[in-house]
């Protein structure tokens, strides 16, 4: 089984991909991880990617597809893959479909974890961590049991990521919508698009995703 997880930054894709990976034996494929692995392996396509990255340029869709092609031939992906962060455009989706068709494979689902922008802004801008041990907290959803004191290590200093501000998050969301909006009708026409409410609790989102995957068996 192969699926694409779509959803905004901060929408919980990574968490859910890990849960599905653990339950179904699927392999989460993130383009960043695959690029780094290809470069480290010294393969032909990895060398091409390294040359482009060293020149400070964006890696082309053609190279990314070649890296995915190579990755799908590896034994650990036999049960299927979860594509996280790719495709981002219709052109990439078409290239991915064509490449998989050559292998006799297909994408079974494109699942959008849908979360309203206001939720994402609240989730991301409220995040902070213990400066000492890295334990995560949130202004609204996960406060320390004792105000100003880390539950894990007792530290009293906390930090926020500079990018976790309203302006930056809004720009990232705008870019996501501009890129991804055309993918939804593309996959809908193919009959593979499914929607899951990402505002539910993490466990409930997982149940909804499992329901989609289990129904296809």
UniProtKB/Swiss-Prot annotation:
State the pathway, as annotated in the record: Purine metabolism; AMP biosynthesis via salvage pathway; AMP from ADP: step 1/1
Which residues take part in binding ATP? 10-15, 127, 200
In terms of Pfam families, this protein maps to: ADK, ADK_lid
Entry's PROSITE patterns? ADENYLATE_KINASE
NADP in keyword set = no
Q: What is the E.C. number? A: 2.7.4.3
Q: Where in the cell is it found?
A: Cytoplasm
**Residue positions binding AMP:** 31, 36, 57-59, 85-88, 92, 161, 172
GO BP term, pick one? AMP salvage
Cellular component (GO) terms are: cytoplasm
Gene Ontology MF terms in the entry: adenylate kinase activity; ATP binding; zinc ion binding
- Catalyses which reaction(s): AMP + ATP = 2 ADP
Question: What is its EC class?
Answer: transferase
State if Lyase is listed as a keyword: no
Q: Could you tell me which residues belong to the region LID?
A: 126-164
Region: NMP; residue ranges are 30-59
Which UniProt key words apply to this protein?
A: ATP-binding, Cytoplasm, Kinase, Metal-binding, Nucleotide biosynthesis, Nucleotide-binding, Transferase, Zinc
Residues reported in the UniProt entry to bind Zn(2+): 130, 133, 150, 153
Domain-related comment: Consists of three domains, a large central CORE domain and two small peripheral domains, NMPbind and LID, which undergo movements during catalysis. The LID domain closes over the site of phosphoryl transfer upon ATP binding. Assembling and dissambling the active center during each catalytic cycle provides an effective means to prevent ATP hydrolysis. Some bacteria have evolved a zinc-coordinating structure that stabilizes the LID domain.
Family of this protein: Belongs to the adenylate kinase family.
PANTHER family per record: NUCLEOTIDE KINASE
Its biological purpose is as follows: Catalyzes the reversible transfer of the terminal phosphate group between ATP and AMP. Plays an important role in cellular energy homeostasis and in adenine nucleotide metabolism.
Q: How does it assemble?
A: Monomer.
Protein name as annotated = Adenylate kinase
> Gene encoding this polypeptide?
adk
């Amino acid at each position: 089984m192969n699926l694409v997880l779509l959803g905004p930054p901060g929408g919980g894709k990574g968490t859910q991909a890990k849960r599905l990976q653990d339950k179904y034996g699927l392999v989460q494929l993130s383009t960043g991880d695959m690029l780094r692995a290809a470069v480290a392996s010294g393969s032909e396509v990895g060398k091409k990617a390294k040359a482009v990255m060293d020149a400070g340029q964006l890696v082309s869709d053609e190279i990314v597809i070649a890296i995915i092609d190579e990755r799908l031939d590896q034994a650990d992906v036999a049960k299927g893959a979860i594509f996280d962060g790719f495709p981002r455009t219709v052109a990439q989706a078409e290239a991915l479909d064509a490449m998989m068709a050559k292998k006799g494979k297909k994408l079974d689902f494109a699942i959008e974890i849908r979360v309203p922008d206001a939720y994402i802004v609240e989730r991301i801008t409220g995040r902070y961590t213990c400066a000492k041990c890295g334990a995560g907290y949130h202004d609204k959803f996960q406060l320390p049991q004792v105000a100003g004191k880390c539950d894990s290590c007792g530290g009293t200093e906390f930090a926020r990521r500079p990018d976790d501000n309203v302006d930056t998050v809004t720009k990232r969301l705008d870019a996501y919508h501009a890129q991804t909006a055309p993918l939804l009708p593309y996959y809908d026409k193919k009959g593979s698009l499914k929607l899951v409410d990402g505002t539910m609790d993490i466990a409930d989102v997982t149940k909804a995703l499992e329901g989609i995957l289990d129904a296809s068996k």
